[in-house]
Swiss-Prot record:
InterPro entries named among the record's database cross-references: Ribosome_recyc_fac (IPR002661), Ribosome_recyc_fac_dom (IPR023584), RRF_sf (IPR036191)
Domain of life from the UniProt record: Bacteria
Protein name, entry field: Ribosome-recycling factor
Job of this protein: Responsible for the release of ribosomes from messenger RNA at the termination of protein biosynthesis. May increase the efficiency of translation by recycling ribosomes from one round of translation to another.
Family: Belongs to the RRF family.
SUPFAM superfamilies associated with the record: Ribosome recycling factor, RRF
GO molecular function term, any single one: ribosomal large subunit binding
A Pfam family per the record: RRF
A GO term from the CC aspect: cytosol
Locations listed in the record: Cytoplasm
A biological process from GO: cytoplasmic translational termination
Underlying gene: frr
């Protein structure tokens, strides 16, 4: 494997780490209704556990209400139970083939918990980036040991790794600040 391939592979994994972090924090409640809130909800349907997205459509009705349109009427009760049991602090109400999910306002204590959770996810993502950096440098060490690259190329690889980690850590930090602002907004 060449130095370029090692760098490209590491950068692709770093991008995935940032995307994964973005997906995780999208599911953290803010004061507003967002469909991402129900992304992780799994419904017991047809003898298996399925994501809510495969059971029906989720839409935002207004700033504090989500509406779930269930495709199969027999799945309304199971879907309502799954939302209630998802530990999101939501109380869904079935209305025919739809389920109305009111998003209650967050109290100060809950907001602080969500900010702390966001920061924890951010720190986990940053740790993943640093591990990928270590992996990248290990690959460069191996190439140098096998006499495929020189010290200068290895030093450049280290510089590239540091720049990549810095770039993606900044993206994560910016996302944390933005999410914190959304959570604390009353």
């Amino acid at each position: 494997m060449s130095l370029r391939e090692i760098t490209q592979k590491a950068e692709a994994k770093m991008k995935k780490s940032v995307e994964s972090f973005q997906h995780e924090i999208a599911a953290i409640r803010t004061g507003k209704a967002t469909t991402a809130l129900l992304d992780h909800v799994k419904v017991d349907a047809y003898g298996q556990t399925m994501p809510l997205k495969q059971i029906g459509n989720v839409g935002v009705q207004d700033a504090h209400t989500l509406m779930v349109q269930v495709w199969d009427k027999s799945m309304v009760a199971a879907t309502e139970k799954a939302i209630r049991d998802a530990n999101l602090g939501l109380n869904p109400v079935a209305e025919g083939q739809s389920i109305r999910v009111s998003i209650p306002p967050l109290n100060e204590e809950r907001r602080k918990e969500y900010v702390k959770l966001t920061k924890k996810y951010g720190e986990d993502a940053k740790i993943a980036l640093r591990n990928l950096r270590r992996e990248m440098l290990h690959g460069a060490d191996k190439l140098e040991k096998d006499k495929e690259i020189g010290e200068d190329a290895k030093a450049n690889c280290k510089k590239d790794a540091d720049n990549l980690v810095h770039k993606y850590e900044k993206q994560i930090s910016d996302m944390i600040v933005q999410k914190e602002k959304e959570i604390m907004e009353v």
